[in-house]
Regions:
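N-terminal anchoring/stem segment of glycosyltransferases
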Residues: 1-78
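A conserved donor-nucleotide-binding helix/loop in the catalytic core
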Residues: 26-28, 33, 76-104
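Glycine-rich loops and low-complexity Gly/Arg-rich segments
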Residues: 30, 71-74, 96, 112, ...
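Short glycine/proline-enriched coil/turn segments at helix->beta-strand junctions
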Residues: 40-44, 97-102, 120-122
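Hydrophobic/aromatic beta-strand patches that form the interior of the parallel beta-sheet core
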Residues: 46-48, 103-105, 124-126
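Short loop/helix-cap segments at secondary-structure boundaries that form the rim of catalytic
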Residues: 56-61, 95, 113-121
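The conserved acidic donor/metal-binding loop of glycosyltransferases
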Residues: 106-110
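Conserved donor-nucleotide/metal-binding helix-loop-beta segment in metal-dependent transferases, i.e.
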Residues: 111-137
Length: 137
């Protein structure tokens, strides 16, 4: 099944206005493992991001990880979105850009085996729940 990662850099730049964009090495490793394991076990994957993220991945030679391409579609996100409060909004915009059925996969989620049997039938599925943190939400 088609999957996608997403990366919206605006929250990074809001928190770090004078820094060059970067991702911690361990996060790059989990991203690589996530994409490669998904491809091996479940199918194609793409990256939906913005231009700074695409340029960053290109500079590191990592675009090969996403066999279905790297698309800077998040450049069109409205400027009035509060990137501090809604730091994950890029995921929703990415989800709206990918035809269903699809899997929205966090870059730190590694799928070690096929999950096709879990995805046959339901209209929507979630691997896990996340607690709502009042200090964040």
């Amino acid at each position: 099944m088609q999957a996608f990662h997403s990366n919206w850099t605006r929250p990074f730049f809001i928190r770090n206005p004078h820094m060059e964009y970067r991702i911690e090495p361990f996060e790059l490793l989990t991203t690589a493992l996530s994409a490669l394991e998904w491809r091996r076990e479940n199918g194609s994957i793409r990256m939906i991001c913005d231009t700074p993220a695409k340029r960053y991945y290109e500079s590191l030679g990592l675009c090969f990880l996403w066999d279905d391409g790297v698309y800077p579609l998040l450049d069109t996100m409205p400027e009035d979105i509060n990137a501090t409060a809604f730091w994950a909004a890029g995921k929703l915009y990415a989800l709206s850009a990918v035809p269903s059925p699809c899997v929205m996969l966090d870059t730190d989620f590694i799928c070690w085996k096929s999950i096709s049997n879990l995805l046959d039938g339901p209209d929507t599925a979630a691997i896990h729940r996340e607690d709502i943190m009042p200090s964040i939400y």
